[in-house]
């Protein structure tokens, strides 16, 4: 063996060993989520799962407070959202929220010291709207959050700004006018796939068409382009990464578009996408004029939410811990629901109707051809505050029980 060969063999062994370090150690965990023998399984790393469970522990609920006595609005000034709570429950809720959102900063993160009624601090205005957001989520979007619900801690996890909030990504700078459409950027947003790096702005902020699969075998019957398919798959990669699952969590991969072969989770995901859009458009964008520059992106757009903001790589946030049920202030009261019944957004009305009657399965029409979402180009976020109406064919899916 020549000296060169003697040096090459150890080098190959070292390189191969380094490459193997990037692989997950066997055996992986497996969960059957569909019919046996058809690949409807979810795979996970057992070591990573144990670490994830440890990192997603809920906060212990505070002891119950007296629900009788005067209301908070009768004792304190400028109480606009939680005015239906007793003083005891109101105080308990304030302490809990401080623990969930600003444990280090304390009450003064949202209140002017010495004058808790003052609105002269932007965080007070924002937090009031966030209370309304949580109440709407728990009361109007049960098709998404079910009876588990959400709390401030679901997103914040002890941080004033949620760790996984996002803004429109301008992408890398190019020296010429020839720009790719976002591929090969190596973005965590699409799980480092070679796909457009910002599927969040067009699909979770705006309401661009997501469906691209046709119903016929021949491609000529489907006007959707390959480029549009890349945007859609970028969103799917983001959702999978955000929930820590694979495609088969929602879809049967032999027919991605067929609702009758999909899992019940796809119905939940349908509502979840619309819930996220509702949060971004109706609760966060209207606060943009109140937020400081430090809470905005390069285009001046506010920090918004995506699936990752709440789920944090877990298919059920905090593994389904029911924290909200211990805090009545995080739900709309009967009085509040009656007052808002006439002004509820249409997107919020759909989930409620889904539990009363079984709507037809989504129509499988061929989606209209669409241009690449404008969010890929710089400056697109300036117009992101406006949302186009949802496509006609995206009616509410049939209840999961009928598709098992």
Swiss-Prot record:
Cellular component annotations (GO), alphabetically ordered: plasma membrane light-harvesting complex; plasma membrane-derived chromatophore membrane
Residues binding heme 1, per UniProt: 94, 107, 110-111
InterPro entries associated with the record: Multihaem_cyt_PRC_cyt_su-like, Multihaem_cyt_sf, Photosyn_RC_cyt_c-su
Binding site for heme 3: 236, 247, 250-251
N-palmitoyl cysteine lipid attachment residues: 23
Chain sites annotated for binding heme 4: 144, 307, 310-311
Lipid attachment residues per UniProt (S-diacylglycerol cysteine): 23
Keywords: Electron transport, Heme, Iron, Lipoprotein, Membrane, Metal-binding, Palmitate, Photosynthesis, Reaction center, Signal, Transport
Gene Ontology biological process: photosynthesis; photosynthesis, light reaction
Gene3D superfamilies (alphabetical): Photosynthetic Reaction Center, subunit C, domain 2
CDD domains the record matches: CytoC_RC
GO molecular function (one): heme binding
Keyword Ligase: no
Main location per the UniProt record: membrane
Topology relative to the membrane: Lipid-anchor
Subcellular location, record wording: Cellular chromatophore membrane
Pfam families named among the record's database cross-references: CytoC_RC
Signal peptide: 1-22
Modification comment: Binds 4 heme groups per subunit.
Region (Disordered): 346-404
SUPFAM superfamilies assigned to the protein according to its UniProt record, in alphabetical order: Multiheme cytochromes
Binding site for heme 2: 130, 152, 155-156
Quaternary context: Component of the photosynthetic reaction center composed of protein subunits L (PufL), M (PufM), H (PuhA) and cytochrome C (PufC). The reaction center interacts with light-harvesting antenna complex LH1.
NCBIfam families in the record: photo_cyt_PufC
Stated role: The reaction center of purple bacteria contains a tightly bound cytochrome molecule which re-reduces the photo oxidized primary electron donor.
The protein's name in its UniProt record: Photosynthetic reaction center cytochrome c subunit
Organism: Thermochromatium tepidum (Chromatium tepidum)
